Amino acid sequence: MAVSPHKTYPIVITHGEKYTLFNDESIGKGAYSEVYRGRTESGRLVAVKTACKKLEVAAIGIEIEILKKLKGASNIVQYFGSNHTKMAPGSVTSETISFAMEYASSSLEAEMRRPKNHRGLSSNALIDLVVDCSMALSALREHNIAHRDIKHMNILLFPGTPTRGRRSTHLFKLCDMGCSKSLSENSSHEMRTLVGTPNLLHPFLAHEMVDPLMAQNRHNWKTKSAYTSEQCDLWALGCTLYFCATGKFPFEHERNNKSLYHKAVVALTQNPDAIAMVLVQKGRDPGRRTDIFEFQPVTELPAKFTRYPKWLVSTMTCLLRSFFHEPSIEYYAKVADAMRNSKRRTFSSVDQMSIVEHTDMSNVPHLGFSIPSISKCLGYPEGTDILLLSNTSTHYLDSKQKSVDGLPDDLYLVVPQTSHVDMRKILARNIEFHEFDDMTDRKLSEIRIKKCYEGLSMLTEIDEYLALFDRVSTILSTQFSLLVQELSQFERVQTASRFAVYVDMASVPLMLFDEANPETKMISDQCIQQAKRAREELERHAKVSMDIEACAKQLSKDAEDLRLEDMDLPGICEEIESYVFYDKQAILSTQKYSQELVELCLKRRNNIMEQIFNSPDRINKSKLNKAMNLAASLSQLRSNYRKLQDMISECVDLLEKPFQEMKDTVNRYLQAQGCSRNTMQKSMHLLRPEFHESQIRIKKTTKSCRKLIDQLNIELDQLGFVRLGDILIKAESEQTLTRSEEIQETQVVSFFCQAESSPNKEQFPKPEQDSILESSIDEGSTSFESTPPSSPPDVGSNNYFQAVFQYFAKPTSSPSSSAK
């Protein structure tokens, strides 16, 4: 701190950065001080608060010391420098004091006087106000300071950006520490000084206001009951937040009837659920000829006009209840932190005609149980499940679910899963405002504010409807396009269908080469029957998929036509706000044109409502009905698509078990007989559709071969001969016969194996397509145990039969071979 070297008067004491005060640029005036615009030596624009009376100087001196302690604290107006001047004794003004602080763009008081906030702040601005005040009170508590005069006039607005959890363009900061008090760390933090604004006082302080002796010595009056900083500051903040949310204070107050406020707050303390008390007329006293009034409790934050989301109404109700009944800055900080940092999702509801910015408050202690489910927060009756559609996903929400966990996207379209949906009631608009010359200034200003509020609220409502139908159109169009894209890719249907054909074909070689085994034949027949059944189901579902795809394509085009056509009224919001006057002459002189502006807003609203609710040609449906039908159609198509997917899975399950049995049988047979895998793959390849004629010939030849072999064996047995290679010999004994059979089998197998490996294969002519067959087998044959190939394996009954089958299955190419 620097002291002027001159000991003569005036004595000037400065601190911090020097500044210049502009006496002709007053910003505001309070009961004890005035605020002017100023600028520091570095060029910063500041607000300079100054006072010259003894009590004012003392109050500002306390405020300067407290602001120094709070330097850098969150959401507290920042201090830059001060100037204290003491005049010579006998001067008209003995001393003056001033200090420079941050220059605010506006105040909460001025914001609440704007016509658009006549019924309360927007939800985003209210949430930021709650969070910023929480941070300010936490900073005061950290430095052991009680503010003791929190109200909307002592909260300043600074430019902000909706980032990092912020929702509005306002940054709120607490100011005016003239009534504040630094508390000792070792003290009980209890206070008895009567200080504060009359209609925001804690009940302990309100009780003192009705004492007739208090008015004579208010500045030195001490309360009978001590109060804490939490009690007085949170009570005043609760009254302020209620006012900012509804446009009215929670308790009736009359300047000349202090007992009215006192009775209201006492009545509230006796009702633990109340957050406000409303004075209502209950009758009339005939003896005294006066009306009888009583206080009625308000147990939930009114939101008829502001249309706050239900999660916010519940949160604010619980918060105000704690302020008035169980004040706790720690609990307030937890709730405020959740309001800023919890997960947020945006839900657009066509039938409710609303866009809800939902914040997940279900995990906040002592608050989550009072938060309604998401379904109820969106305006649906108890027990209504909902379908949520985004640009990328679809989710079903139970009617009791409160958390947004599992919802990855930010924006969703809501489709209630119920046959009957009640539409949200749209408030009727009344623009009949009469401003007459015989009205008082106050009455005229109230009417003008209501008139401008109606016009601005209609514009806000229109903007919400435009945004709603834009989002609905985008989401529905995208969802239908995604469905078309999914249905155009029949991968599951095609894969399962190919599998069914494969099972059918894979059963053939098992029947060809092992017809003598009844068990194997039964498995093959079962596979074939199941495969045919599954293939028929899949073909039917493929057709259903094509129908759904065609329907989705058409509905996607219809969804693009949901957007509303709007009248362009540039700058009308600012123009309406400029016609808010408090002077009688100004109000009467602008009556006609201000009414024209409001009527223009109504015309724009009627144009939008006409598109939403009425058919354009009495043939086509209205935008609202079309949007609801499209949403329901999308839900139904999605349901049909899910059933289709489930049926495909059932078809695959139907095929899997018998096919696995057949596959195991084939593998066991191959292992037992020692047949080569290459032979199996060749027969599988031969069973492809392009070799259909060859397949028929093989089947016929196989049956003929079996008959010929059986007949030949019978005749040889009757004649008593045994075939040894190309030689028939007489069977001399049973032992000789057995030996002959073994030699015969060995020679036949050896003979045919040499024929297969020999380059000269004229003895066994091949079918016309054998050259193509062999090349394709070598290039792309697959294993029976890997991904299903297009044809099944070849398995012979035994080596002798296999050799004979290969011999007789091939057509003869020359007479010599036939004779042989």
Swiss-Prot record:
One of its GO terms (molecular function) is protein serine/threonine kinase activity. SUPFAM superfamilies: Protein kinase-like (PK-like). Disulfide bonds: none annotated. GO terms for cellular component: cytoplasm. InterPro entries: Kinase-like_dom_sf (IPR011009), Prot_kinase_dom (IPR000719), Protein_kinase_ATP_BS (IPR017441), Ser/Thr_kinase_AS (IPR008271). Its EC number is 2.7.11.1. Belongs to the protein kinase superfamily. Ser/Thr protein kinase family. Interacts with allo-1 (via N-terminus); the interaction is direct. Serine/threonine-protein kinase, which plays a role in regulating allophagy, an autophagic process in which paternal organelles, including mitochondria and membranous organelles, are degraded in embryos. Phosphorylates the allophagy receptor allo-1, which is required for allophagy. This is Inhibitor of nuclear factor kappa-B kinase epsilon subunit homolog 1. The gene is ikke-1.
